[in-house]
Amino acid sequence: MSDEQSSWRSKLLLICQQTRSSSESIHFAALKDHHARLQACESMEKAMKERCQKKITMSRRTKRGITHAGYLFEMPHNSVFEPECRGFYESCQQTEMASSDLQAPALEVSSTYPVQQAVKSRPEGQFPESRNNSTKKIDAQQYSSESSSQSGFGFRTAREQLIMDELKKKNRQATSEVDAVPTGMMNFRKKTLGGKRTVSSNFVSPVAQNDNSTSSRSSSIPPALAHLDSKMVDHILGESMHDFKPVAWEDIAGLESAKSTFLEAIIMPLRRPDLFTGVRCPPRGVLLFGPPGTGKTLIAKSIASQAKAKFFSINPSSLTSKWVGDAEKLVKTLFAVAAAHQPAIIFIDEVDSLLSKRSANENESTLRLKNEFLIHLDGAASNEEIRVLVIGATNRPQELDEAVRRRFVRRLYVPLPTREARQKIIEKLIHQVKHNLDVRQVIELAELTDGYSGADVDTLCRYASMAPLRSLTPDQMEVIETHQLPAVTMDDFKQALRVISKSVSSEDCKQFEAWNEIYGVRH
């Protein structure tokens, strides 16, 4: 047996081995294709031998001086020398097929055989039509039907490459879709897990990719954020960006001096940035500190409502990740998203837990997160064109890092509500329920709640308003109407005062006042 016959026999054995677990139709088609290639190779060899014999005969006659005046050599048809290529069987080059090539997944060899780039992206036989009427159009459907009859081991033949090049020239606007091939091409490869990789193999993700969801998600992202990770942008928009009910200044009792400062330094610059430029550039970092429950978060929402700005509420969990380096990227994405939706307000509640004092024993990832936040916070304050305000709220200003304290230019103290402020809070809350309190009793309640924070007064009023419901039995509560409920009385509030106590001590207030004397803004 010659070497060529041994080679063809080895190919036949490899095909039988790879298709033994496939259906009978696929197995029969593979054997039939192999036989056709063998016949084409034998016919080509026969033609080559005949041509060589004619050349030898002509050379001998020339040497003997025998010529034929009317002899005209006719070039055989190209199909004699170049039979239609069927994948990896190119008889003219005598290329051998190795077992590793049969084991490699067909879709992974994208750089060598780019015809498989978009096998699943287009139905069979649908190619973009050419708009150039001056050139000859190629019937894509006919090409699809011809290609579907080929065996197609995932390779691109010279004829296929020529047709693809012509389609690309005629369809400049659809070059991304031209690489698609008909799905009808037969693929005899047996799918394996962890097949042998070759030099030309590309990485294939083990997770199936959904192109439709990715494109729809990326289309909702503004063009200014196209350079960022779409997943991080969605995370910031989903976790931090909130739509809340607008809060007016009248909803905040007291703090008249602080309101004037907010209006001058924050609200008007955000609404009229053309007036506040150069030296008049407003501060972009504001720190609200004071006892808990004094309305620091409510003030931030009111500022966002008055300035007609987007409100981003940040907590430490929104900027942390188990992957190294992702926390810094989330901080960068946060400021980029806020700049894209300007005017915007980034509110960081309990900022001391995120930007506390740095130490040598601190975790490296936490330290990098703080440094990245400080860099962007300083950048937001130095760029006059970006209307992004960063508001931090804390009840432990002593724990803040010195660099953070410097970047929060305006440090405003939010104290406990005064007697007039507590009176307004009580009047606003009891107005929602049926009561029989007069102005004198409301003033008395405001004096009895000295040292209470705004949250404490709110809790007191809610507890007192539940007294009429507590006086009812379960059976009465089932049948009673809303207008039949008893009114809230002064005795109900006195009972609530015995249950609800203040949550802020006088020592805590002295510490806040001392820190305000050193670092705070004096109204």
Curated annotation (Swiss-Prot):
Organism phylogeny: Eukaryota, Metazoa, Ecdysozoa, Arthropoda, Hexapoda
Residue ranges, compositional bias (Low complexity): 141-151
Cofactor: Mg(2+)
One GO BP annotation of this record: mitotic sister chromatid segregation
Reactions this protein catalyses: ATP + H2O = ADP + phosphate + H(+)
Alphabetical list of Pfam families matching this protein: AAA, AAA_lid_3, Vps4_C
Residue ranges of the TM segments: none
Any one annotated GO CC term: chromosome
SUPFAM superfamilies registered for this protein in UniProt: P-loop containing nucleoside triphosphate hydrolases (SSF52540)
Gene: Fign
Name of the protein described by the UniProt record: Fidgetin-like protein 1
